[in-house]
From Swiss-Prot:
Residues 336-347 have a biased composition (Basic and acidic residues). Residues 232-381 are annotated as: Disordered. This is Ecotin-like protein 3. GO terms for molecular function: serine-type endopeptidase inhibitor activity. Belongs to the protease inhibitor I11 (ecotin) family.
Length: 381
């Protein structure tokens, strides 16, 4: 810390009853000291303030000039104490610093000390003021934070094991093994493993490479082909007296057709849907895939349908046919239904006549036998 003798300035000694106080200011930029910094001198003394009120001191601060040098120094005189205002202070601290009501603000000059002569028992305080410009400049002149050192990355080759000690900034993703390659399964192997089916033999492999790598068919179609072996040979039973048809085996359907053909004498006319070779009759398995309906036909499809199966066949084919064929098949079914009704009526009349003629023939034979020959006496007369 510097002393007053370092400046080689002959400041006067303190008068009796006074004390010399010296303030040493830190060195700053000369331009900043002249334009942006100021010093406030605050003389005062400690007083007992039991009531907790704030007080001020009367007195004055006088600036004097050292003759022959031109340097300034300040002389302070303190008077009586008075209450500044009625706001309360800290009551626990009864003895407080009471400042002079006059606190002069002087220029900031770090080249010279500030010399102040105060009465004995007094205390000198000061405050340094600055404006926003100097504050901004001091912020700009602050040294920047040192840059962090770059982490040292260890080069890792393919297949190298992860070291036991990793660097602090190293990422764990740098030590990943990349020499593992899993063999991929083909589509056929995946399908075979999912369905638990044995591997394909060479004769069952497709000839085309495109078909060999194609996706397998849907599981629903596979289940229908293998889970319903007896559905191919089922046909629709014809309607009898308004009852809906039920499914029967193909052999029983063929026997029923032969019986109906032997009992009927009139020829049958078939619709365009039934007679056309391009559209085979649909059975109860019409919802199967189209390939199965072409490749696997029921043995009864080669036989020509009779009258008794016309309505059932038309109803079955009407589900999957277009609108035009459906309307034509509907008109044909109505015509055949009317013919069937006429046929049934004639057969009923025939049987009724046969039943009604049987007692007449019996009575006629009895009358004929009575006229031609004499009857034997019953009583024996």
């Amino acid at each position: 810390m510097p002393s007053l003798q370092d400046y080689h300035v002959p400041y006067p000694a303190a008068a009796p009853g006074q004390v010399r106080k010296v303030i040493y200011l830190p060195r700053q930029n000369p331009t900043v000291e002249q334009q942006h910094l100021r010093v406030q001198i605050i003389p005062g003394r400690h007083e007992n303030c039991d009531d907790g009120r704030l007080y001020k001191l009367t007195g004055s601060v006088t600036e004097e000039t050292l003759q022959g040098w031109g340097y300034s120094y300040y002389v302070v005189t303190l008077g009586d104490i008075y209450a500044a205002h009625r706001s309360s202070s800290d009551p626990a601290r009864a003895t407080t610093f009471v400042a002079l009501d006059e606190s002069p603000v002087i220029a900031y000059n770090s080249k010279l000390p500030i010399v102040v002569y105060v009465p004995e028992g007094a205390e000198l305080r000061y405050r340094i003021w600055t404006d926003d410009a100097s504050l901004a400049q001091s912020i700009q002149q602050k040294p920047e934070a040192p840059a962090l050192p770059q982490p040292h990355l260890v080069p890792v080759t393919e297949g190298q094991e992860c070291p036991q000690e990793l660097p602090r900034c190293g990422a764990p993703s740098e030590y990943v093994r990349q020499d593992y390659k899993a063999s991929m399964l083909s589509v056929e192997e995946v399908h075979r493993l999912s369905n638990n089916t044995p591997p394909l033999i060479p004769s069952a492999v497709h000839e085309s490479a495109h078909e060999a790598h194609a996706a397998p068919p849907l599981h629903s179609a596979v289940l229908e082909e293998h889970g319903r072996p007896g559905m191919e040979h089922l046909e629709v039973c014809p309607k009898n007296n308004g009852s809906e048809g039920r499914e029967q085996p193909a052999e029983e359907a063929s026997t029923l057709k032969q019986r109906s053909s032997s009992s009927s004498s009139n020829p049958r006319h078939h619709s365009a849907n039934e007679s056309s070779p391009s559209r085979p009759r649909l059975s109860s398995t019409a919802y199967w895939p189209q390939e199965n309906s072409k490749t696997k036909r029921s043995p009864s499809a080669t036989h020509k349908p009779r009258r008794s199966t016309d309505s059932a066949a038309i109803e079955e084919t009407g589900v999957g046919t277009p609108k035009k064929n459906r309307s034509s098949s509907g008109s044909a079914s109505n015509k055949r239904k009317a013919e069937d009704d006429v046929y049934e009526k004639t057969m009923k009349n025939f049987w009724n006549r046969a039943r009604s003629d049987s007692p007449r023939k019996a009575s006629a034979s009895s009358t004929k036998s009575g006229n031609g020959s004499k009857a034997d006496p019953v009583d024996g007369k």
